[in-house]
């Protein structure tokens, strides 16, 4: 029998898809059994043309969540993101990037590349590069390395430093998602 929680989650996904949502980002998807995703994603996709993106940090599980879980894309955090960040911070040689795409043979097109998101420190923050310009070659690598999608996080295109004393986490080089907060760089760009 299908667990009651699974049926309720299906109802929630269908509710939002009916409202016009065209994709779901599933935070820490690997903490949910792949059997659930195997059951629910085809049911949602049968009714609506939606995209499913998963946050999965265990590379040994990537193929399982793509092939059995039916996810369209997975965040490439522990591969490309961590490697490009290390290169940008002079902690690793650029040649390490080759190993990223080599390890993803057959699924590279299912990986979502990014340099910033709500979990990671902003490139321009003092905790990362202290300047947005080192992000330019990193973004070129992320965007041009393959045919897979690339994500630009709100404010990244303007060099948002995320260095305000905001939210519960304080001054940590990240932009809060838990409180209403204004990105100074985005606000200034809009008002200019």
Describe the residue ranges of each PLM region.
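Conserved short secondary-structure transition element at the edge of the structured enzyme core
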Residues: 141-159
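Surface-exposed cleft-lining segments at the edges of enzyme active sites
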Residues: 123-127
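Active-site mouth loops of central-metabolism enzymes
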Residues: 1-8
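Catalytic-loop motifs flanking and including active-site residues across diverse enzymes
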Residues: 138
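Active-site-proximal helices and loops of the catalytic beta/alpha 8
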Residues: 11-14, 22-111, 128, 132, ...
């Amino acid at each position: 029998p299908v667990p009651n929680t699974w049926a309720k989650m299906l109802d929630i996904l269908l509710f939002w898809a009916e409202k016009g949502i065209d994709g779901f980002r599933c935070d820490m998807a690997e903490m949910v059994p792949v059997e659930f995703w195997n059951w629910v994603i085809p049911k949602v996709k049968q009714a609506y043309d939606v995209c499913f993106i998963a946050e999965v940090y265990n590379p040994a599980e990537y193929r399982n969540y793509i092939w059995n879980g039916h996810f369209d894309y997975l965040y490439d955090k522990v591969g490309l993101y961590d490697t490009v960040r290390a290169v940008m911070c002079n902690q690793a040689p650029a040649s390490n990037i080759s190993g990223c795409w080599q390890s993803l043979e057959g699924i590279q097109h299912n990986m979502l590349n990014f340099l910033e998101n709500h979990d990671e420190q902003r490139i321009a923050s003092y905790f990362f590069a202290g300047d947005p310009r080192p992000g330019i070659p990193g973004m070129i690598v992320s965007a041009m390395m393959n045919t897979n999608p690339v994500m630009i996080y709100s404010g990244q295109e303007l060099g948002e430093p995320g260095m305000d004393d905001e939210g519960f986490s304080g001054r940590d080089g990240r932009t809060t998602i838990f409180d209403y907060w204004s990105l100074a760089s985005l606000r200034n760009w809009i008002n200019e």
